[in-house]
Structures are given as C-alpha cells and as structure tokens.
Amino acid sequence: MRVIDVEHLGRPHVIGCWEVDGMLVDPGPESSLQTLLEKLGGERPEAILLTHIHLDHAAATGAIVARWPDLPVYVHERGAPHLIDPSRLLASAERLYGDKLEYLWGKIRPVPEANVTTLSGGEVVRGMRVAYTPGHASHHVCYLHEDTDTAFVGDVAACRIPPTDLVIPPTPPPDIDVELWEE
C-alpha cells in the first residue's frame, strides 16, 4: 500500500493516487498520467476504484483503460454514466475552467460501459468494503481496506497527501451538499 504523488502540473503534494493490492484508488487527472505511469514502473493495475468522478480524482481513468482495455473500473452508480459519456461532465467543467480545462486536467476519454461496475454502497470489492458517502458529491463512496482497516475517503473528510500534515477541506462547486457532508 502506497500513495503515489502524481505531481499535478509538476507540483508535489497536490494530488495523490493510492495503490492498494495492485488496485489504483483515484488515479488523478490525465494531465498527470505520464507521472503516474512512470511511478507504477510499467506495471498493469488490477483495477481502478473511484471515490468520485471529479477531474482531480478520475480524469485519467479513460486513458488508463485505453492502455489496458480489460481493466475493471468501480464507481458509484450516479457517477458511472459520466465516465461512460463524459460530455455533460466536460460541459460543466468547461464553464468553470474555460480554456484552461485541458491544460489542468488533460484529455478526458470515455470509459467503455463493459469496463464499469456500478456501486451503491455495502458491497465488498476486492477486499475493500464500499460505503456510500454523499455530501462532497452525490456520487461519492469511500473504501475500507478490510485487511488493514485503512479507509480511502476521497474528498469526503478533507485533503491531505502524505508526508505533509496540511489538511484542507474540499468544497468544490457546483454539487457540494454541506448538510449531507456533515452527516
């Protein structure tokens, strides 16, 4: 188990991808894919588990699946349609980021439906118990690694990339639901 700093836009300690038992939890943006692949040392992941589909967590997913076409991807059922057809996600992101969208997050590719397994919460996926945790996003899930009791919480709690101790609350537009998040 290790965190892989994908060095977003060349900056360390901004976005991290966890590698757990050969699986990638939140591979990050496509703009950082080359760094992620280098740090994986050419090894094919076993699966991708997404806590949510925001671009800083999931934008590299389609490109990774294009590289390894049989790679399974796990995501909440509300996020799955936007991985399969990212057009609405991209339209929303373009309103927010404008002409910086591709620079910041890379080229977002669709994930074939055959690769996507939807989650609702309560499942166990490859030794990871899934919890539905809306608030930060309506399609947010967390994963509990049952062997080590380690939780992978995406942005539902806060943002911190080891080895730093800095914790930042994640509050992105447009779908933050503070009341659900506080539950």
Regions found by a protein language model. Name each.
Residues M1-E43, Y143-V153:
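Conserved beta-strand hairpin/beta-sheet module of binuclear metal-dependent hydrolase folds
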Residues P29-E30, L55, H139, A158:
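Short, glycine/acidic-enriched loop or turn micro-motifs at the edges of active sites
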Residues Q34-R78:
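Active-site metal-binding motif and surrounding structural segment of the metallo-beta-lactamase
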